[in-house]
């Protein structure tokens, strides 16, 4: 007989969670995070100060999705309470880079002496602060913050050169919650 898979997540103080029509919303001091969560055979319930993610089936896919949804929900609640922050370092040897935030775009000028600026997208409600040789990417959605930092790092990737010698770029040096 198949056994039921059940994960219980406690809701921290100051966070309100609602689940209606397969959309989970978590509100806290930093803002509101919403996410569409639906998978066949996986149920989500909000009961008072806890969230129950369960599945009547113990198949591999349902078990994996219960764990995935549990992680997504805990990250949503961490984001609205503490937020996520990535620290990045600007490294150059000969040509000094000029970096600036222009609306929802992150602009890198004079990378390796290039005339054309490199432009990276800032996703969602993520904020980017550039000062000197440090870039701070912060927000309440872990996926948007991480993808924005990765986009910036990838825009300064040097192709067809040895990365041990040509180390110019913008690199992630620290991740904080």
UniProtKB/Swiss-Prot annotation:
The keyword Ribosomal protein applies. GO terms for molecular function: rRNA binding; structural constituent of ribosome. InterPro entries: Ribosomal_uL6-like, Ribosomal_uL6-like_a/b-dom_sf, Ribosomal_uL6_a/b-dom, Ribosomal_uL6_arc, Ribosomal_uL6_CS2. PROSITE patterns: RIBOSOMAL_L6_2. Pfam families: Ribosomal_L6 (PF00347). GO terms for biological process: cytoplasmic translation. This protein binds to the 23S rRNA, and is important in its secondary structure. It is located near the subunit interface in the base of the L7/L12 stalk, and near the tRNA binding site of the peptidyltransferase center. This is Large ribosomal subunit protein uL6. It comes from Methanococcoides burtonii (strain DSM 6242 / NBRC 107633 / OCM 468 / ACE-M). The lineage of its organism: Archaea, Methanobacteriati, Methanobacteriota, Stenosarchaea group, Methanomicrobia.
């Amino acid at each position: 007989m198949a056994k039921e898979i059940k994960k219980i997540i406690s809701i921290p103080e100051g966070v309100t969670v609602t689940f209606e029509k397969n959309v989970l919303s978590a509100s806290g001091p930093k803002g509101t995070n919403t996410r569409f969560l639906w998978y066949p055979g996986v149920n989500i319930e909000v009961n008072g100060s806890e969230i129950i993610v369960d599945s009547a089936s113990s198949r591999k896919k349902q078990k994996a999705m219960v764990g995935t949804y549990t992680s997504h929900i805990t990250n949503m609640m961490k984001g609205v309470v503490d937020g996520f922050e990535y620290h990045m370092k600007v490294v150059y040897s000969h040509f000094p880079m000029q970096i600036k935030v222009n609306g929802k775009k992150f602009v890198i000028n004079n990378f390796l002496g290039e005339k054309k600026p490199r432009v990276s997208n800032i996703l969602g409600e993520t904020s980017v602060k550039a000062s000197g040789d440090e870039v701070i990417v912060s927000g309440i959605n872990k996926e948007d913050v991480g993808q924005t930092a990765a986009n910036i790092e990838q825009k300064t990737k040097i192709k067809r050169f040895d990365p041990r010698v040509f180390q110019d770029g913008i690199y992630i040096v620290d991740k904080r919650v």
